[in-house]
C-alpha cells in the first residue's frame, strides 16, 4: 500500500515583519538579508500558539482533502516550538479537531521536519498500520 497527498492546508499569522523593520536591530539592510537568506518578509506569532496555527492549517487540509476528522488514523506534528512539554502539540490538535481515532505524536527535527514526518507517515501507511495520516 502506498500513500499519497490528498489535501494541503496552510496558516500564517497576520503580523508581517519586513527586512527593513529589522535593519536597526540587526544593523543591516534589506539587500544584505535577501542576498544571504532569500527572505523578504516573515510572519511572526503574536497571540497565536503553535497548536492554534497547526489546527488552522489542518482544518484547511482536511477540507481540501474532503475527508472527516474521524477518518484520520495518525497525526504527526513536527515542531521545535511546542506550546507545552506535555501534552504534545499533536495531542492538542487531535483534541481540537475531534480526531478521536488518531494516534498522535510530535517530532522535533527542525528544518527537515516535514520530510521526516512525511516519511514516518508513509512508513505507517506502507506497513498497513494506518490509512489516513495528517502531517503538520
Model-identified regions with their sequence ranges:
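Conserved "HGTGT" condensation-loop signature of ketosynthase/thiolase-family condensing enzymes
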Residues: 1-73, 97
